[in-house]
Amino acid sequence: MNIDREAPIGVFDSGVGGLTVAREIMRNLPSEKIVYFGDTARVPYGSKSKETIIRYSRQIIRFLQEQQVKAIVIACNTASAFALDAVRDEFDIPIIGVIEPGAEVAAAQTKNKRVGIIGTVGTVGSGIHAEYLKKLDPTITVFAKACPLFVPLVEEGWLHDPVTDEVAARYLKELQDKEVDTLILGCTHYPLLRSTIRKIMGEDVCLVTPAYETALELHRLLDEKGLSSEGTEKNEFPYRFYVSDLADEFKAFANSILPYDVEMTKKIDIEKY
């Protein structure tokens, strides 16, 4: 398969959370173009079945292939847990997820071998973070906690709100009691609540946000495949954004967290794919 190295990277998530990954790609791979898709009509993914998540992921990848992307980042932990293996087998394009990079950092950082994971019901229920961590270091004890209200709170824009603080305190108490020294933010929405989580967990707990590590993993993949952009193609709009619903709301949120002025977000009918 002949892939154009100046083609964009496809990035997708259930909503706005994957923007934390897109942001790190922008910062660390500035020559790369991005096509981002947020499945805002069907968020959250965390409560959906594995079969449904695989179907959604296939639809989105078909759409991204239509945009002629050269590689795809599944910037969603639930889709990475449930769909990554299936779509890698099915599509002839390099695809990475966000779970392995985070697990590798957590295994390297923990001192007391007690690692916490927070994520959606689907991600936590899959046990995939624990599986990766145990492969890396069998002596690690893993404590997982589903935090299903975090995604709706982020999508609502309640990043600094007393309600969010109260919800976070209730969710995280269990992990505080387990004395974890490292906490994986196992959903790409959760870094947007980092300051709240930090306040509750304290300064001594290492918070692992896989977005940065995922950008580095993407960089390694592109180099390995000979697909890194040489930055010779100038483009007035290097970053394009698509959603399945609520385009204006998405655009406003994206502009609040990205180091780039998002001028247009286009709504598409993802069910066609």
Per-range role (PLM):
Residues M1-Y273:
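Non-catalytic structural scaffold of enzyme domains
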